[in-house]
Curated annotation (Swiss-Prot):
InterPro entries: 4Fe4S_Fe-S-bd (IPR017896), 4Fe4S_Fe_S_CS (IPR017900), NADH_quinone_OxRdtase_chainI (IPR010226), NDHI (IPR004497)
Organism of derivation: Phaseolus vulgaris (Kidney bean)
Name listed for the protein in its UniProt record: NAD(P)H-quinone oxidoreductase subunit I, chloroplastic
Membrane topology listed for this record: Peripheral membrane protein
Record keywords, A-Z: 4Fe-4S, Chloroplast, Iron, Iron-sulfur, Membrane, Metal-binding, NAD, NADP, Plastid, Plastoquinone, Quinone, Repeat, Thylakoid, Translocase
PANTHER family named among the record's database cross-references: NAD(P)H-QUINONE OXIDOREDUCTASE SUBUNIT I, CHLOROPLASTIC
Main location: plastid
PROSITE patterns attached to this UniProt entry: 4FE4S_FER_1 (PS00198), 4FE4S_FER_2 (PS51379)
Cofactor note: Binds 2 [4Fe-4S] clusters per subunit.
Subunit structure: NDH is composed of at least 16 different subunits, 5 of which are encoded in the nucleus.
Catalysis performed (reactions): a plastoquinone + NADH + (n+1) H(+)(in) = a plastoquinol + NAD(+) + n H(+)(out); a plastoquinone + NADPH + (n+1) H(+)(in) = a plastoquinol + NADP(+) + n H(+)(out)
GO BP annotations listed: photosynthesis, light reaction
GO molecular function, one term: iron ion binding
Amino acid sequence: MFLMVTEFINYSEQIIRAARYIGQGLMITLSHANRLPVTIQYPYEKIISSERFRGRIHFEFDKCIACEVCVRVCPIDLPIVDWKLETDIRKKRLLNYSIDFGICIFCGNCIEYCPTNCLSMTEEYELSTYDRHELNYNLIALGRLPVSVIDDYTIRTIQIK
């Protein structure tokens, strides 16, 4: 008789413990039910990127001194810098600068180590194309400023916290 009572007490304690665990899990689930949905309707809604977002690289041709620091610090030696030495003024003159965004890993080393700050990251992240050769940007394509997501009136912007 005593054995049967202790088994019943152990069984009831296990039932109470299981009900408590189920209740805790249910409370966590219900606390998430009050949150707003995270999904956005992409072409019509866009997320405002953070201040430190690493998007497409912007290049300012006039500031570049063709020092090739960006090529040396790039982990994949990606930027292609063509220059010519001007003998009369003994300085390098930049002829061409290009980056292939199909290969770029957007690490930001080129921007961080550039001595003249001619490179900067933009908030542009829409780089998809049907032909991968279109992702090879020369100095003219790198020089154009992207359309700001905030300034585009056709798109509803969403701030994610």
